[in-house]
Amino acid sequence: MNPADQQSIERFVRTTLGCKCPDEVFESIVLERVPAPDAALPCTRLVIGNRLLIYIHETQPAKATKEAVSKLTTQGRTERDAKHYNRYRLVVASDYPTELLSAARTGFDSVAGTDQKAHLHVLATDQLPDALRSGDTNLSR
């Protein structure tokens, strides 16, 4: 991963997602494409400082159902707990984020409930840094 990608990812995580992690957490960034609970739900997996787990799922409203978000939320929370990460963030990105916000929130809340260490972010696709949309695999810092 080049320094520009590292900086854009850190800026995205801090500014867009609101992460307040200390600087040293960003010394380790692992980025990879991973299979999701089924082939229709691919996502990018991002681990920051072995503390923060982020799944990024790009979709369009017709495909963004509460069931899809529920599956990704379950998978992410399970991984967070198994690997002892502090937080899990699910980013659902679409060209039409307002059209899927309600279904995404319903699917997320049905699984995460009051889990204060799990967060949903529904964003416009153009808010994602290029490094998170590239599809490159096994990129590490």
Regions found by a protein language model. Give the residues of each.
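Generic surface-pattern signal
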Residues: 14-18, 22, 31, 74, ...
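A short, terminal or domain-edge coil/loop segment
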Residues: 4-12, 35-44, 78-91, 136-141
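Acidic/glycine-enriched edge-of-secondary-structure segments
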Residues: 27-28, 48-70
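Generic detector of short, locally flexible boundary/turn motifs and exposed helical patches
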Residues: 17-22, 51-59, 84-88, 130
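Long, charge-dense
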Residues: 107-141
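Amphipathic protein-protein interaction modules
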Residues: 59-112
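Conserved beta-strand termini and adjacent loop/short-helix elements that scaffold enzyme active sites
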Residues: 57, 93, 121-125
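N-terminal, charge-rich interaction modules
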Residues: 1-52
